[in-house]
Amino acid sequence: MKPLVSPGLAKACTGLSLIGIVFLLVLSYLFSIEAETLMHDLVGSGLTGKQVAKTCLGAVVIYAVFFLFCGSQVIVSRYQKPVRI
């Protein structure tokens, strides 16, 4: 099986996806406990902290899919035999 993206791009995508997952999980937790620092931005919007936390978790799922795809590309490129001419 050939990788779809280069190894460098796959590693960068994997790293950024992991950072995004961690960041969004922290934001989701803070919105779910309705941290005062974040909640004042929601005043007048009609949104609750729980709704925003669910949205953050939805984004975590998307980032997790990218993490799995890019991580699989790193593994595939690691085991690919070099082309010999």
Swiss-Prot record:
Mainly resides where? endoplasmic reticulum
Q: Which portions of this protein are annotated as coiled-coil regions?
A: none
Q: Which GO terms describe its cellular component?
A: endoplasmic reticulum; endoplasmic reticulum membrane; vacuolar proton-transporting V-type ATPase, V0 domain
Q: Which UniProt keywords apply?
A: Endoplasmic reticulum, Membrane, Transmembrane, Transmembrane helix
Q: Which domain of life is it from?
A: Eukaryota
Instruction: Give the molecular function GO annotations.
Output: RNA endonuclease activity
- Residues crossing the lipid bilayer are 13-33, 56-76
**InterPro entries from the UniProt entry:** Ribonucl_Kappa
- Give compartment(s): Endoplasmic reticulum membrane
User: Which membrane topology term applies here?
Assistant: Multi-pass membrane protein
Has the keyword Endoplasmic reticulum been applied to this entry? yes
Q: Does the keyword Endoplasmic reticulum apply?
A: yes
Any single GO BP term: vacuolar acidification
The job of this chain, per UniProt, is described as: Accessory component of the V0 complex of vacuolar(H+)-ATPase (V-ATPase), a multisubunit enzyme composed of a peripheral complex (V1) that hydrolyzes ATP and a membrane integral complex (V0) that translocates protons. V-ATPase is responsible for acidifying and maintaining the pH of intracellular compartments.
Partners and quaternary state? V-ATPase is a heteromultimeric enzyme composed of a peripheral catalytic V1 complex (components A to H) attached to an integral membrane V0 proton pore complex (components: a, c, c', c'', d, e, f and VOA1).
Q: What is this protein called?
A: V-type proton ATPase subunit f
Specify the species: Schizosaccharomyces pombe (strain 972 / ATCC 24843) (Fission yeast)
